[in-house]
Amino acid sequence: YNFKTNLEIKDTPIKIDFINYKKDKNLNSQFKIYGNYSKKFGLEFKKISLLSKNNKFIINNLLIDKNNKIVKVDKIDLDYFDNDNLKNKFIANRTKNNNYELKGSLLNADFIISNLLKSKDGKQLDIFKNNVNITLDFSDVYLDNYNVVKNLNGKLRIKDDKAYQANISATFDNGKKFTFTINTKDDEKITTLFSSKAKPLVNRYEFIKGFEDGDEGYLDFYSSKKDGISNSKLIIDNFKVKEIPALAKVLSLASLQGIADLLTGEGVRFTDFEMNFTNKGKLMTIEELYAIGPAISIL
């Protein structure tokens, strides 16, 4: 059967969590949706649109099967201000079969990154019926409210609702690099992340306060996962923190430089930090850790 709905929404909030959007109840919006349903093919939305002042959400030809999985979507056109009051503007087009192009001028990835870091290991998406290939092309991407990468390009392959392959790169304003890769072979998944600015990622951990990058600082992460066990290495170079976990803070007071750094509020400085660790289920085991700086060395 066919359906068609055209509504003017007043005095009603609308919340779309996965794109970090909430419509204020005082903002009037036009909502349109039409399509058809059949037992054989599932639910097909010919068009979904939500329009209001400064915000546009349009989806064309979205097909969902009886298991509520996306079979295909021809086009998604989004232009809106999110809950951080940052503008997002991008279009997703299906180019051929299960290949998609995601292209835009602005994307706030802060919400996406935070959710990925908070997600529980092993939690799987349940979105796509088919494996999909996505090409990415963004002019500006916010990593948080203050840090932006430019010319983000790359490719992402999703297989069995998991990120199977990825090769993504971008640059900061100073021309330094940001890269992210995933390579899966013989049931082993290797993930790498390199950022010439560590702050946009490290600042998300509440127990670390006042983190600042040095001019030559960077973050380098490598992880190999197989049979539910991951072996990882994290390196952060040239940084300082104003508040650090209790053990490191006590150790830093063993040197005159550490006392001076903490009392003056300058923070404890490190030239090198490296940690090797494994994850299995909910258990993380730190195999080796060292941090070196003028005020403190931890081995």
Language-model features, listed with the residues they occupy:
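Membrane-proximal interfacial segments on either side of biological membranes
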Residues: 1-289, 296-299
